[in-house]
Amino acid sequence: MAASAAETRVFLEVRGQLQSALLILGEPKEGGMPMNISIMPSSLQMKTPEGCTEIQLPAEVRLVPSSCRGLQFVVGDGLHLRLQTQAKLGTKLISMFNQSSQTQECCTFYCQSCGEVIIKDRKLLRVLPLPSENWGALVGEWCCHPDPFANKSLHPQENDCFIGDSFFLVNLRTSLWQQRPELSPVEMCCVSSDNHCKLEPKANTKVICKRCKVMLGETVSSETTKFYMTEIIIQSSERSFPIIPRSWFVQSVIAQCLVQLSSARSTFRFTIQGQDDKVYILLWLLNSDSLVIESLRNSKYIKKFPLLENTFKADSSSAWSAVKVLYQPCIKSRNEKLVSLWESDISVHPLTLPSATCLELLLILSKSNANLPSSLRRVNSFQVAFLKM
């Protein structure tokens, strides 16, 4: 294959389950030099009179050059082609609570944004998933006896941690000696027929980080607190606080939530809503087996793209496992009819996050969409994005 380019953008999406790949070589700039492109099992090579650029693929991915098909040139985008691959991508999600020994260690809860210690040296003896919101209906339909837990809330004991879709429930009774996170002010509300007003906290009071003032969660009762997964890092007390860029952490947590929920409940459509019940984003999970490799600039040096690196620097790797989603922004009263349809559909699952995090996620999706080749940015009325895992 031959083309002319001064700089060429390379985009490669590998699908682990389908064992296929989409390769896009960006449209060259005017006046670019002739360039020969070679596709080899472990690399892509681009030669110009000035030199050679080679892009090394991760060890887990091998292309099948002879399977090249669907070759076409898309104006404004570049050269498109599809290939078969031999890919062994690790898609197993690792939770901090997967290992039974982890629950016997002392853990420390940190604010992810600033590293403030929220709960120190908590020994978690039981880490349990919460039942789904349809649990009561299932019991009533399939069991011959009434549900003994009807209309009762599940509250963790002193050394428990209950895991919801996007949050942790913990008991703060044993943490009273510590400096606790701030609570939002109580609100005035009328509670009697005589319209006498008294101070009464909201049903779910915001829990705020004292250092950075980020919303971490909500109080469920006098002893139980809900912490959102996107705001808290739970780490063994023997380890130091891990510094992770905010955008990387948010999209990784959301991606894992989507994958786990789709696997457990066969749910692929989600509404992302704030703690104020306002819907910010409609998300549709397309697939969770993508490996995206991209080179944003041409260089005469060899570029290597390891599959997963232990560093979280944004420029350290251009290869990453990801989930592919369709999304619709719903801020400023956009897509109101579609939001209403999705909210009334029992197959759509709501995910509640702090309102500020919903806006962060929308920015992350928008940036991902803007970085895609132009032909991949839309599917019908939905926008396309990748969330790194």
Swiss-Prot record:
InterPro entries: UBQ-conj_enz_E2-bd_prot (IPR019193). GO terms for cellular component: cytosol; nucleus; ubiquitin ligase complex. Zn(2+) binds at C144. Its EC number is 2.3.2.26. Interacts with UBE2C/UbcH10 (E2 ubiquitin-conjugating enzyme). In vitro, interacts with cyclin-B. E3 ubiquitin-protein ligase which accepts ubiquitin from specific E2 ubiquitin-conjugating enzymes, and transfers it to substrates, generally promoting their degradation by the proteasome. Independently of its E3 ubiquitin-protein ligase activity, acts as an inhibitor of CPSF3 endonuclease activity by blocking CPSF3 active site. PANTHER family: E3 UBIQUITIN-PROTEIN LIGASE E3D (PTHR31531:SF2), E3 UBIQUITIN-PROTEIN LIGASE E3D FAMILY MEMBER (PTHR31531). This is E3 ubiquitin-protein ligase E3D.
